[in-house]
Regions:
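Catalytic cores of glycan-processing enzymes that make or break glycosidic bonds
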Residues: 1-107
Length: 107
């Protein structure tokens, strides 16, 4: 969270909104956008975004070491393909990543 504040992606006075009693940040779409922007601004040559992050899935997609307890490779997304393609979220993520990558290129 401090890195997001340092990059100007999260206001310092809002840090408390994202902290839980367990010390693990509470995920919100706003926090997710800040994280995507932060990653896109990195100097990494490759950046990938999981479709689960685009559609806002909160359950972990793959739990290593499980077989029958967790259907790792049979999970369905909560949105269908049309909702993903024609919804606003995919274009928002593409915009955040494009803007971040352009900033990274200028560094």
């Amino acid at each position: 969270l401090q890195a997001l504040v340092a990059e100007g992606l999260l206001a310092p006075e809002r840090l408390g909104e994202f902290l839980s009693d367990s010390g693990t940040p509470t995920y919100t779409p706003e926090l997710g956008d800040a994280i995507l922007s932060y990653l896109a601004r990195s100097r990494a040559r490759l950046m990938l975004v999981q479709l689960e992050d685009v559609v806002g899935e909160s359950e972990q997609a793959n739990l290593p070491g499980t077989t029958d307890e967790h259907p790792n490779w049979r999970r369905r997304l909560s949105l269908n393909l049309g909702e993903i393609i024609y919804g606003t979220r995919l274009s928002k993520v593409a915009e955040l990543v494009t803007e971040g990558r352009l900033q990274a290129a200028r560094r």
